[in-house]
């Protein structure tokens, strides 16, 4: 089996596992969040049941909401299966982590594609859009790593920008494919994005709020505007440097990716990182990659918290360098922790300006932004994250 065949088989197995997790959502959610609450309700005394007379109705509504969410995920899976087929050996059953990611997609779809979450999207857009309008050329090439289910791509391409998204998660990629390409009409789908969160509610009915998505028709909204595409894979692997980065779980030595990285050099006018830079186990790889992919004089716009995804992860990986002439591994580090390098915003700005030849144009801190937060007027849900916003400009004479 050659390198490409191996990569394709591995990718097919990963995609199959995600599609099956979509198909199993209803079964999983009924088991994990509904059946257990029914059992708890059955266990209490009749006297206590009389104290909460509406709880039986609540449980029935919770079950109905799970079933509706299941319809959404089945639609996503069925759409994906129109263009993907699998060999029997590629069918892999999802694990609990896969199912948890599937459940969390409801929050992501609500955040990106509902009218109710426009205030969350505007935390970035109200800052980014006016700045982009000052740039030349007006048809800038924009890269959005960690593009999620694709809403920011749509919004910016509608303004005339040529947008390329990058996404590592197959969960996100399959949902984005559906939201962008399935010809969905405005408010065609109803989801119940809050049913996996049982805390902080003022009224129990709010947890069962139905949300209509999408609030725009993405498939028709960018006609005659800028281009839009999505590249699947690790940001560092697809766009990073070919030298000076160690091989790891997110960076490979394959010939195909080497060519991709060479092509990416100095190719973008703007990189927009939105709730992204805290997602990697080595943020310096991200910073190097941003510097590599931007054209001289290019702009890096960042928005989001620094809630490092791996700060409490005790997992390990092997990292190493590869001799470009012999192909042998060198400087091998076994059991490299995934945690570590949780840099502050001051650290990041300092590295960018002092080592990567960026100039700081604008900076804000302490911006409160929700993340899939229920938007009701009396919401007691967690308020969200304290976010950082900055704009950095690469040196116009900089050569990667």
Swiss-Prot record:
N-methyltransferase that mediates the formation of anserine (beta-alanyl-N(Pi)-methyl-L-histidine) from carnosine. Also methylates other L-histidine-containing di- and tripeptides such as Gly-Gly-His, Gly-His and homocarnosine (GABA-His). It is an enzyme of class 2 (transferase). It comes from Saccharomyces cerevisiae (strain ATCC 204508 / S288c) (Baker's yeast). Belongs to the carnosine N-methyltransferase family. S-adenosyl-L-methionine binds at residues 108, 111, 146, 167, 235, 286. Present with 952 molecules/cell in log phase SD medium. It holds the Pfam family CARME. It catalyses: carnosine + S-adenosyl-L-methionine = anserine + S-adenosyl-L-homocysteine + H(+). It comes from the Eukaryota. Optimum pH is 7.0-7.5. Optimum temperature is 30 degrees Celsius. GO terms for molecular function: carnosine N-methyltransferase activity; S-adenosylmethionine-dependent methyltransferase activity. InterPro entries: CARME (IPR012901), SAM-dependent_MTases_sf (IPR029063). Changing residue 154 to M: In strain: SK1. The keyword ATP-binding does not apply. Keywords: Methyltransferase, S-adenosyl-L-methionine, Transferase. The keyword Methyltransferase applies. Carnosine binds at residues 278, 309, 385. This is Carnosine N-methyltransferase. One of its GO terms (biological process) is methylation. Its EC number is 2.1.1.22.
